[in-house]
Amino acid sequence: MTAASEKTTRRFTIDCTKPASDSLISPSDLGAFLQQKIKCYTGKKEKLLHINANGNIVEVDVTGGFIGKQGLKWQIGRFLHMKKLRAFIKIFAQGLDGFELRYINVEEGKEE
């Protein structure tokens, strides 16, 4: 890594408003899962990764770029799979640094 990439900080936002309003998932549970599962350099996780759950939005601050948007999306997918919600909730991109969790309309996929 270069010195410039170590100092850059990216903030990812995960909007859990729709599933959290129905009490399917808790944003604090998602934040705790991400804190536990995201791998980092030994002993440096506290400095490089900060996760805050404010209301229905989870904010992930990453310093150094050790996890990107695709890796974070994969971890969110693992969380939904663990909660057995992967078949009902899909992860959509929301801008360059954000995600939104929405319900999948199962009826659209059926042919008549």
UniProtKB/Swiss-Prot annotation:
GO MF annotation list: RNA binding; structural constituent of ribosome
Subcellular compartments: Cytoplasm
Keyword Cytoplasm applies: yes
A GO CC term attached to the entry: ribosome
InterPro entries named in the record: Ribosomal_eL22, Ribosomal_eL22_sf
Pfam families on file: Ribosomal_L22e (PF01776)
Biological processes, Gene Ontology terms: cytoplasmic translation
Domain of life (superkingdom): Eukaryota
Keyword entries, A-Z: Cytoplasm, Ribonucleoprotein, Ribosomal protein
Quaternary structure note: Component of the large ribosomal subunit.
Record-stated family: Belongs to the eukaryotic ribosomal protein eL22 family.
UniProt protein name: Large ribosomal subunit protein eL22
Source organism per UniProt: Encephalitozoon cuniculi (strain GB-M1) (Microsporidian parasite)
